């Protein structure tokens, strides 16, 4: 529970930092399509809970958005992109093969979203944050073997 709360704070803190620095950087959130309570909440303009959050990217398995984080994200995020477990796994493999970095599912989600939006982002300066390598070795081996 604490880990998921910290994940919600991750985008919140980036929004706050951007605002404190007076930047106009667009910040895009990413959620698992199987755990999209935050995306649904932003679309509804109020907190929406989900019955399940069935994703292997456990750092994104949020069913109930934290109110403080929701308010900051609603006010400061450009949008939220939903990514599938398959897209997350692909991003994990890209990090492993191309940069020799280990990324957990939630940590690779930003790259998955960027890949999904590659045409929309073409020609733009984009930053992606890789965070977290907290993944079970057997699960990581399965993800790598799928590619």
Regions found by a protein language model. Name each.
Residues 17-18, 26, 37-60, 65:
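Anionic-ligand binding region
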Residues 66-123:
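Active-site-adjacent helical/loop segments in soluble small-molecule enzymes
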